[in-house]
Curated annotation (Swiss-Prot):
<feature type="transmembrane region" description="Helical; Name=5">
    <location>
        <begin position="201"/>
        <end position="221"/>
    </location>
</feature>
<protein>
    <recommendedName>
        <fullName>Olfactory receptor 9G9</fullName>
    </recommendedName>
</protein>
<comment type="similarity">
    <text>Belongs to the G-protein coupled receptor 1 family.</text>
</comment>
<feature type="topological domain" description="Cytoplasmic">
    <location>
        <begin position="292"/>
        <end position="305"/>
    </location>
</feature>
<feature type="disulfide bond">
    <location>
        <begin position="96"/>
        <end position="178"/>
    </location>
</feature>
<feature type="topological domain" description="Extracellular">
    <location>
        <begin position="86"/>
        <end position="96"/>
    </location>
</feature>
<feature type="transmembrane region" description="Helical; Name=6">
    <location>
        <begin position="240"/>
        <end position="260"/>
    </location>
</feature>
<comment type="function">
    <text>Odorant receptor.</text>
</comment>
<dbReference type="InterPro" id="IPR000276">
    <property type="entry name" value="GPCR_Rhodpsn"/>
</dbReference>
<feature type="transmembrane region" description="Helical; Name=7">
    <location>
        <begin position="272"/>
        <end position="291"/>
    </location>
</feature>
<keyword id="KW-0552">Olfaction</keyword>
<feature type="transmembrane region" description="Helical; Name=2">
    <location>
        <begin position="65"/>
        <end position="85"/>
    </location>
</feature>
<dbReference type="GO" id="GO:0005886">
    <property type="term" value="C:plasma membrane"/>
</dbReference>
<dbReference type="GO" id="GO:0004930">
    <property type="term" value="F:G protein-coupled receptor activity"/>
</dbReference>
<keyword id="KW-0716">Sensory transduction</keyword>
<keyword id="KW-0812">Transmembrane</keyword>
<keyword id="KW-1003">Cell membrane</keyword>
Amino acid sequence: MQRSNHTVTEFILLGFTTDPGMQLGLFVVFLGVYSLTVVGNSTLIVLICNDSHLHTPMYFVVGNLSFLDLWYSSVYTPKILVICISEDKSISFAGCLCQFFFSAGLAYSECCLLAAMAYDRYVAISKPLLYAQAMSIKLCALLVAVSYCGGFINSSIITKKTFSFNFCCENIIDDFFCDLLPLVKLACGEKGCYKFLMYFLLASNVICPAVLILASYLFIITSVLRISSSQGRLKAFSTCSSHLTSVTLYYGSILYIYALPRSSYSFDMDKIVSTFYTEVLPMLNPMIYSLRNKDVKEALKKLLP
């Protein structure tokens, strides 16, 4: 730590444990999870690109979600693996900044993508005859582009504000990556304006997409209840089940960490929940979107010899 300018040149990531046996076990687990994430998401992207039956608005967005999950997991896992097997737990100031920027940008983008998918499901169920016109590839591309651009613009704002603080107290982060809350805890100076910005971005990038998702599902439920046959209603709900599962798991994790009152906040619980949405969920998403999907299964059969 450089005392002359009262800031730090690197941070120390404590990770999960200091026990060598546990660290080795965690290394094997995280390597296995990351391998499945890479294989699952890469396979889904290849299937969507290669099979003409999957060249639809829904799969266009699903493919982008797989790409995002692949990128998202890759932001964290290499450093986690190093922390698990190396005595050097440090990450440079620049490395921490980059990890923070990409993790925030991808998290914001995923919230918007999930909202776009909810709208896609609403159009598919409520206006099936006009689906191709209402959800054109151009519109899907625009929704994806807005999701990424909006996510990373907002990420650049919070990143610049976060790393403009002086970290003059300690450089030890009680986490396995450079997350917002542990960094804010280390920062010195007035944080009133920062907290306002933090909650504003939380509201605009997480809560607003969540409201849009809820609104879409309210309209979906209304449309489904108008379907006369029980088989038709079941098929309509089945169409939304994979997306609803993904939304519940992702938003449940995000809101638990960032919207929970500070009086009940725990860094240990934060690590567990963060592990779920940064490592486990990107691995599960390809399974969630493909296990019950006949089109994906057929495309996989064609791809395999």
